[in-house]
């Protein structure tokens, strides 16, 4: 049989969460109370938010005192009205001046969980899902029934005045009335309410195919990524004779925003006036920190890797072989081979110390990231590499693949928009009959065979002409799918080069698939 203390710890405790802004929905409240809801061995017994409006006590403001006397005292009609109607008029006036808030009755298991809920959330500021502060604070109070306060049951005898009164017999709010509230009777699919039901319950319903998809959308459920629970790695080591220092518990939302702690005596209106100053100070700090950050397209390590071979010393490409005709002394039993591996020779080839350690900070590297970036020297260097690759047949620079109007990147496409409104499409000529030239003409300014004077840019290349491959006189090899080079062995591109680990010397062997006609050909009889 359980002791009375254990029963008191397991008995449900009812609390009232008040001051909830009307703009908050159940999905935002799930994010706000996620840390308490998802804890192991605890959480809410029931938290079903139904947007129940609350009516705060009337507060006399100095503006109302200076406004004049009570209108009910001056107007005889309001003076003759019942007291309940007068209170309703005052309540409507005060509600219009204040922000409308809601409340909700919740239940937790035991007094320890109730104290933990009060310690974590009572008096903290409200936050939405984006981490924005909302007016008001979270107020949590324990709900005590009249029978719990007096520790007495209902008195069986009544006086004559009580018998003649028209008041209801069940006017006192009892525990049975409390359990009939819609906040404590959630749907079957949400046993702990739309706010208090943990994610593991919804996961079980999804596994059993019993959860409607609309609930996931309404509550904005975000399930964690599947993976190890790390239940064995998160166990702390218990040292002997160790004293634990109690620290203030930080409360976070589901998005990782920390819920600020503050006393209820602080004026939220005064805090709202300080926000623009804080935003300006934060913007100045961001500008100062942004000046120190390195936002260049070519980082320092990328430059070092591009200018030096084997920067990590893992590929061992520094040990190169160099053969030279030298006088070789006969060695009995020797191989007769000499590999010249003098490191001093290669250090002299690399230059002095300044040349070896230079990172070329004066060179504009933006041309390797942006086609129109860089200075003239960098663009000319890329153009020279492009022409050399075109001569060697390594680059396919056909003019037919270019797009019309690449200059419109600088004009924001204004000319294209105007022509498209008139019915023009890409690839068509101008005019009502589309008889114009669809492609722009290159104005060289001189005869193409004239290789002197103003306007001469160098050798005129024919990028659309493919070079003929020389016929091989070797043996005919049967190719396989494994002869095709891997993606990391495709060779260098115009703006990027392959790492030293890629295969540079290999025989190109194109794989030719067998045709079905050759297989289906009938054999001669």
From Swiss-Prot:
Record-linked InterPro entries: G_patch_dom, GPATCH3
Put simply, this protein is called G patch domain-containing protein 3
Could you describe the subunit structure of this protein? Interacts with mitochondrial MAVS; the interaction is markedly increased upon viral infection.
Instruction: One Pfam family, please name it.
Output: G-patch
Q: Name one GO biological process term.
A: negative regulation of RIG-I signaling pathway
Does the keyword Nucleus belong to this entry? Answer: yes
Query: Per the record, which residues fall in region Disordered?
Result: 54-85, 246-317
State any GO CC term. cytosol
Q: From the Swiss-Prot or TrEMBL record, what is one GO molecular function term?
A: nucleic acid binding
Q: Which residue windows does the record flag with biased composition (Basic and acidic residues)? A: 300-317
Keyword terms of this UniProt record: Cytoplasm, Nucleus
Question: Which residues does the UniProt record annotate as the domain G-patch?
Answer: 411-459
